[in-house]
Amino acid sequence: MGWNLLFFKNAPFKPDLTQNAEWNRGAYLVEGLEHCAACHTAKNLIGGDTSAYLQGSNLSEWYAPEITSNKVTGIGSWTPEQIVQYLKLGSNHVAVASGPMAEAVTNSTQYLTDADLHAIAVYLKSQPGSDRRKPLALPADDPQMKMGANLYEVNCTACHSSDGTGIPHLAASLANNPAIIGPDASS
């Protein structure tokens, strides 16, 4: 009851008249029916959304990544078609849905029309991203890098290839993947 009083908005969707119909349809779906912020927006101490809208959030032992225009930790470098493919099939050449996101695809987004999925893509790509940047690389001769290279070669190259580009529709590309570069790669 208290959470509803503080955070629940019992009001109809109001379109942004400065945006086109497709953007507003995307906003309606993201903010309402698909409720993306429930997982992808960090919460405050009493469970309300923080101002970091769609900029990623920890959910128990899962991390829901940033889904904004940030080109490093978000989906800003994805094309609208890659977003549509991800939401429809659960994978594209950049990422593979797993955990709660796989459930969202299986139970919800795969059933949306291509037009609705494209509207979601347009809306998400318009959202301001966090100020997170790509972390600084360690020197190649650093012991941690050598150990990581060995672990990758032994455990990852069969599916993700030696250059990290993956196999389309089977193993996601790890190169420049926001889920890997983001603040929490546990998912």
Predicted regions and their residues:
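Sequence/structural segment immediately N-terminal to covalent heme-attachment motifs in c-type
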Residues: G2-L5, K14, T18-N44, D49-G56, ...
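Short, electropositive, low-hydrophobicity segments enriched in small/polar residues
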Residues: V30, V94, L170
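Gly/Gly-Pro-rich "capping" loops immediately C-terminal to redox-active cysteine motifs
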Residues: K43-E81, P100-T113, G166-S187
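Post-cleavage N-terminal segment of exported redox proteins
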Residues: M1-N20, W62, E81-K146
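Generic structural signal for individual residues within well-ordered alpha-helical segments
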Residues: N24-A27, V84, H118, A175
